[in-house]
Amino acid sequence: MNRIASYLRTYATEAERPMATDVQPSESDVERLLRQRNVGISAHIDSGKTTLTERVLYYTGRIKDIHEVRGRDEVGAKMDSMELEREKGITIQSAATYCNWKATPPTERSNMTGDAADESTVTTQKKHDYHINIIDTPGHVDFTIEVERALRVLDGAVLVLCAVSGVQSQTMTVDRQMRRYSVPRLSFINKMDRAGANPWRVVEQIRTKLRMPAAAMQVPIGAEDNFQGLVDLVRWKAVYNEGTKGNVVRESDDIPADVLELAREKRQELIEQLSDVDDEMAEIFIEEREPTIEELVAALRRATVACRFSPVFLGTAIKNKGVQALLDGMCAYLPNPMEVRAIANDTAVAKKIAAQANEEGHDVAAMQSSAQHGSEVQLVPATEAPLVGLAFKLEESRFGQLTYMRVYQGILRRGGIIFNSRTGKKVKVPRLVRMHADDMEDVQEIGPGEICAMFGVECSSGDTFTDGSTTLSMSAMFVPEPVISLSLTPEGKDTSVNFSRALNRFQKEDPTFRVHVDSESSETIISGMGELHLDIYVERMRREYNVPCTTGKPRVAFRETISQPAKFNYTHKKQTGGAGQFGRVIGYIEPMTVDEDTGKDTAFVNSVMGGNIPPSYIPACEKGFADGLEKGALAGYPVCGVRMVLEDGAAHSVDSSELAFRIAAHAAFREAFRAANPTILEPKMSVEVIAPVEFQGTVIGALNQRKGTIEDTEVREDDFTITAEVSLNDMFGFSSQLRGLTQGKGEFSMEYKKHEPVMPNVQADMEAAYKKSLEKK
């Protein structure tokens, strides 16, 4: 009760921003939220995320038996519910579930004892019941949006790493995503039973490659295929999983002699690492005093919740070892929903700030930034507060559209009326469910801090829902731009309806899946994050909609941009008898980097003073700018990284119109674009290759042949890892080449890194080819 009272006293006083409501969490809110965790499990592909989640569900009693990925037992892992996921052995869509866990507090000193023949988890004198919402995310970079939107709504995460491979390319992507949303994380080094497992190398990689202070919470007893158990460095006990499925957890005060010295060394290392990021632990370290278990646990929790430290747990999910300790760690060190500061924008306040700034003649970009930050409020996880929830994922089910929702404050009720803050529309919630992969459980209401799903609510991913009493809106998630495209043609007759239906559904579900019709060839073009990403959607179209398709050759997502500012002063004048067309625009364009608040790298800024261009024509000028972004002047690729600033102009009382100013702005943009030293950009990929060490020279030669730049090489006893930067345009066909070079033993992954200018000779060829294609028309 003292802890509850403490939360009630300090919740409002610790707020960094104005509170969204005067209502505070009640005692029952605090009591419930203290025992709740919202956790995502993320990692590089094949690190064992889904296998780990399967064990978590089994040990918490959520499922009755353990099944493996790839459907080896003709059942498949619970969280891989799609047929394609079970066939390919990869997670394609993030899957949500929930479970309850009786956690042993790290400060609990009593031993666990039990009969190994008893297949139930052994109890202790004191345990606490925790409710855990879990989202299992894909590891393949092509499905990175699934990780993005999961981390947007979660309070904590488990970053799974392979004990052999360590930090890999997608690990670094997930790390960036966790930092983007300030998500505290535990690290779990999986596959400790594999040959070549080296947890200390992986811990060092977390510190150096991910730049995250970290230390092991455990020391392994035995190595590789002789991996037997773990030494808990906080509670100073030897821990063993026994029973056929690791259900029985046995603890002992006797630390094996062969690991005793290492355990002492690693415990001291844990304290030293913590003292670098926690002031209270630093004082204890300076005093050369041994911290108590309570002091150590408190410091671990403070540093983890503040995203300054990552506790590292060890285990092997496939061999059922170390999972229960990780569950205890989730409950002990990851934040509850009250410890995460959820921020929303009050749109009414934002409009007032923007209007005031406009009246005072401030720069438009500064005005927008001021309105964004000045309207921020902190949401309160109280049931009595006005409802605020975020729709973070859409999915089509046999019952209609399924909308996943995180409730931040207030209560969402079945049959209740909610308002979409983006559209202003009100909708009724016909059905409310908790998800367990593809199964669901109907509920009547969901409180703050919970994750649920709604049926029959039309919306878009990233929409905010309220009860209509507030003008709050939460920021949407970051959506990366597609890097690859291909043409798609449905086979057979009478497939056009299902073809359109499938494309519309896939676009609603996945913001990184884009569709457009090529204006020149009239082909349907789909764009996405990689070849596998698009292949999955083509296959889903065949299976789910009975629409087999023919695909064209993949196309790289080239872009055009500028490298210096350029002014424009353009007049569009046309007289054809009667009312003509007149519009004059003056201003400049300049290079622009990605805006951290909006995630966009193009912007139109209205700096017109004095009304030389009537305000009613400004939106038409912005549309003209948008028209210019669609096709660059060099090779017809979309334009990025440009800000257009409109400073002045002129209008005619009779001949001016929206169309005239739209044409004028478009022509002015194209004219200035040519004068701004434009260049063509191509996507550069971070490529990671793992293969047996005897093929190292051959693989490096293949990457050099594709004009790759080797960035890092790590050689182990049996295999090696090479990281290189290669143009996506040079990576087609590498998969089959690598199989041939390594006798099928090599594997690679790649992820988008950045867009960079193409070589001058390549740009000249692309410009010539584009000019030639225009001449043929």
From Swiss-Prot:
Pfam families xrefs: EFG_C, EFG_III, EFG_IV, GTP_EFTU, GTP_EFTU_D2
Organism superkingdom: Eukaryota
Main location as per UniProt: mitochondrion
Instruction: Say if the entry is tagged with keyword Protein biosynthesis.
Output: yes
Cited Gene3D superfamilies: 3.30.230.10, 3.30.70.240, Elongation Factor G (Translational Gtpase), domain 3, P-loop containing nucleotide triphosphate hydrolases, Translation factors
Alphabetical GO CC annotations of the entry are:
mitochondrion
Q: Where in the cell is it found?
A: Mitochondrion
**What does the record give as its pathway?**
Protein biosynthesis; polypeptide chain elongation
Q: Does the keyword Transmembrane helix apply?
A: no
What is one Gene Ontology biological process annotated in the Swiss-Prot or TrEMBL record? Answer: mitochondrial translational elongation
Entry GO MF terms: GTP binding; GTPase activity; translation elongation factor activity
Question: Other notes on this protein?
Answer: This protein may be expected to contain an N-terminal transit peptide but none has been predicted.
Name of the protein this chain belongs to = Elongation factor G, mitochondrial
- Species, as recorded: Malassezia globosa (strain ATCC MYA-4612 / CBS 7966) (Dandruff-associated fungus)
Q: What is the lineage of its organism?
A: Eukaryota, Fungi, Dikarya, Basidiomycota, Ustilaginomycotina
Gene this protein is translated from: MEF1
